[in-house]
Structure formats: C-alpha cells, structure tokens
Regions:
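Aromatic/hydrophobic beta-strand junction motif of beta-rich domains
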Residues: 168-171
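N-terminal exported-region signature
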Residues: 1-164
Length: 171
C-alpha cells in the first residue's frame, strides 16, 4: 500500500506493525481508508500511498479518541471540513506536532486545516454516542490562507517528533 519509502513502523488506533529485516510484525495487517495512520521511518521522505482515491469515505467516531484519515486531495479549514453536528461533538483535534481545541464553536490552536494524506486524533467525551459523518467536499478557496506550517526551528533546538506527544490547553 505504501510506496517505496523505507518504513520501520506504522501506528494505527489500537494497532501497530514494525518491520524487522523486511518482515512485518504486529497487530496491523491491513489499512483502511477511514482510519488514520502514523508512519515511522529512519529517513526523511514523502509517503506515497498506492491505490484508488477515496473521497467518499464514511467515518464513525466512537467515544474518547479516534485516529482517522483526511481523504481529500485538497487542504480544508477545520470549520469548513466538518459538518456542524460533528463539530459540536468534538472537543479537540491533534495532528503531528499541532493541535486545536473547540472553544464555543471556534477552533483555537496551531492546527488550522486538514491536509491531504494526514491522519488526525479526534477527541470526544468518554460517554459520547457513536456518530457517523463524511467530510464536507472542499470548494475552491476553502483553505484560503490557512497553513499548518510551523516556524523554522533554530539548529540548536532541532528535535525529532515523538509519537508520544502531549498537548495542554490552558485558559
């Protein structure tokens, strides 16, 4: 499924797989268009996903944390991408090194838009009922000038992104 990048691991919601000498081990044995995945590699590169585009993916969000994909090829602002009834049910969204919290219907934080090919953790209350949704179809100009690009870090402060990240939302 993944292109020619030299991957050492793939993490999904409640599953993972690691490559040891070219053989994959773990509980993750297939990928699903509706699920999100974080991939690990020893080298910088772009992950090419091989297969048919999946723009009409239906997602089901259960209570607590959900790792899901963003299936469109165009970036889209959070508020434009999510149907209103879903926005009301999600209190935070976390990406790789970025996050936003829903403050009375406004998304506040470093995550401004969903990017093509990315996975996101959607946080919901622990007792929430399942909801099913599809992202709104992007239209020209949806992502306007929004960007999730973080500032360049000076060389002496460069770090490796951890899969064990934490975010704290302080009022």
């Amino acid at each position: 499924v993944f292109g020619d990048l030299d991957l050492i691991g793939v993490i999904g919601e409640g599953s993972a797989a690691a490559s040891v000498d070219g053989t994959w081990y773990g509980s993750l044995d297939a990928v699903d268009a509706a699920s999100g995945y974080w991939v690990q590699s020893n080298v910088d590169g772009t992950v090419d996903v091989c297969g048919d585009p999946a723009d009409d993916v239906v997602y089901t969000l259960h209570d607590a944390n959900n790792l899901i994909s963003y299936s469109y090829g165009e970036s889209q602002a959070i508020g434009d991408a999510l149907p209103d009834n879903v926005e009301d049910e999600v209190f935070a969204i976390v990406g790789e090194g970025i996050a936003s919290i829903n403050m009375n219907g406004f998304w506040v934080g470093s995550l401004n838009s969903f990017d093509a090919g990315s996975g996101y953790w959607f946080a919901r209350s622990a007792d929430a009922a399942d909801i099913t949704f599809q992202y709104n179809v992007p239209t020209a100009g949806d992502a306007r000038l929004l960007s999730n690009e973080l500032p360049v870090v000076p060389e002496e402060y460069v770090y490796n992104q951890s899969t064990e990240q934490g975010f704290y939302f302080v009022e």
